[in-house]
């Protein structure tokens, strides 16, 4: 089920991103320094008082004719429309400005719970300044210093108090997947074709409060799927154009809710930076991935076309070497019947557990093939390994010194584990930890 969503809004330079980072915590750290892995942190997941929620950072809004301001307002309006709770950030150092009043007028129209966070209240003497912000008519102001972490707990308490009631727990065996990709790659046609191919009765299921329609269906073997809709909001009746900022934001939300992501490419247009950016986020989030090349029927092909495409994909998505590639046509339904089985196989891979004894046999065999590296005369020693999580499969390798585990050797061990076990379509995480 969709997580509740919190939007952080305000004029430029009031510290929205600092507050966002403070709330998001470690979630926003970059896991892998790999080209194409997203660095865009407009969206993250946080947890407070055992309530999990999504947070969206937005650009600074101002009532001026500045470059890109219309796009920024547009993105912020979308975020506010999606949000269950809105955090309005202002600056205690500067007091109420015309831009603050402009944003406040936007917020009046949302009829959503508003948390007024007066940021940059960095010392106790400034706390009296917050009373001026009652004039905005948005309730009690919360004094905050995002830089020092002062007052953020009070803001989080207020957020949790205003979250919608928790939803019923979903069927744990259900596989959730989404189709992501640039506008016009044919996601909607693929969704319709997949549902038609399954010949099932599709039932729309509303999300928590945003009316983002998911579709639940069952295949011929009785496996239940939830297809997560990324087509946008319908609640307000508004139609939003596909600005990149918005499509990135909703793709991130869909990825976060998914077990498996179908990364859809357009055979007519090739691979773009947007594709790599979104695929990088799915990889970093540890999701199962299938690379789906749609509109395959539109290309003039020879015996090398598919091979050339595969080589190009592997070259441009090097960090997705584990992801299967399938060439399909939503129009002719070419190969679409294979997708549900691929999704099920990847879901099984994500949930695979390897007994420690078997895993350590593979590790020892790997060391025999390629001995552990040395650094300044000191050799890496691997004592044992164990699996600590699934979705994605995560392994901790206990060593004498963590810094002796070079990235290249960790990658070698990953490749050996992949050769020994079926982990198609899912990333696996290996973590070196010093044995105590």
UniProtKB/Swiss-Prot annotation:
Output the Pfam families linked to this UniProt entry.
KH_dom-like, MMR_HSR1
Q: Where is the KH-like domain?
A: 352-436
> Any idea which positions bind GTP 2?
181-188, 229-233, 294-297
Q: Which NCBIfam families match?
A: GTPase_EngA, small_GTP
Q: Which family does it belong to?
A: Belongs to the TRAFAC class TrmE-Era-EngA-EngB-Septin-like GTPase superfamily. EngA (Der) GTPase family.
Q: How does it assemble?
A: Associates with the 50S ribosomal subunit.
Question: Would you tell me the protein name for this molecule?
Answer: GTPase Der
Species name: Streptococcus sanguinis (strain SK36)
């Amino acid at each position: 089920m969709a997580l509740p969503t919190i939007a952080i809004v305000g004029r430029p330079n009031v510290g929205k991103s600092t507050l966002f980072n403070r709330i998001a915590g470690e979630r926003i750290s970059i896991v892998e320094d790999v080209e194409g892995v997203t660095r865009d942190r407009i969206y993250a997941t946080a947890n407070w008082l055992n309530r999990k929620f999504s947070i969206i950072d937005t650009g600074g809004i101002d009532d001026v004719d500045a470059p890109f301001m219309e796009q920024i307002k547009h993105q912020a309006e979308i975020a506010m429309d999606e949000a269950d709770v809105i955090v309005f950030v202002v600056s205690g150092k500067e007091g109420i400005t015309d831009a603050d009043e402009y944003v406040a007028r936007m917020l009046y129209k949302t009829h959503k719970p508003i948390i007024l966070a007066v940021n940059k209240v960095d010392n106790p003497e400034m706390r009296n300044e917050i009373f001026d912000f009652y004039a905005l008519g948005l309730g009690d102001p919360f004094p905050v210093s995002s830089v020092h972490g002062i007052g953020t707990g009070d803001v989080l308490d207020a957020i949790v108090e205003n979250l919608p009631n928790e939803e019923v727990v979903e069927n744990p065996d259900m596989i959730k997947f989404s189709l992501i990709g640039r506008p016009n790659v044919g996601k909607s046609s693929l969704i319709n074709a997949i549902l038609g191919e399954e010949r099932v009765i599709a039932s729309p299921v509303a999300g928590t409060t945003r009316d983002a329609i998911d579709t639940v269906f069952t295949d011929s073997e009785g496996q239940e799927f939830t297809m997560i809709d990324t087509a946008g909001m319908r609640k307000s009746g508004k139609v939003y154009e596909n600005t990149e900022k918005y499509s990135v934001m909703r793709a991130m939300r869909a990825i976060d809710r998914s077990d498996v992501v179908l990364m859809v490419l357009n055979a007519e247009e090739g691979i773009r930076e947007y594709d790599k950016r979104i695929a990088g986020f799915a990889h970093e989030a540890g999701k199962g991935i299938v690379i789906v090349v749609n509109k395959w029927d539109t290309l003039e092909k020879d015996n090398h076309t598919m091979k050339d495409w595969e080589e190009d994909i592997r070259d441009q998505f090097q960090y997705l070497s584990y992801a299967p590639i399938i060439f399909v046509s939503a129009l002719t339904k070419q190969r679409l019947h294979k997708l549900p089985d691929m999704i099920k196989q990847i879901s099984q891979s994500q949930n695979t557990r390897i007994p420690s004894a078997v895993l350590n046999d593979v590790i020892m065999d790997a060391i025999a093939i390629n001995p552990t590296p040395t650094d300044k005369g000191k050799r890496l020693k691997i004592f044992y390994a164990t699996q600590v999580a699934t979705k994605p499969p995560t392994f901790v390798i206990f060593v004498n010194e963590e810094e002796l585990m070079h990235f290249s050797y960790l990658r070698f061990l990953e490749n050996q584990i992949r050769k020994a076990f079926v982990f198609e379509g899912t990333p696996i995480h290996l973590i070196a930890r010093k044995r105590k």
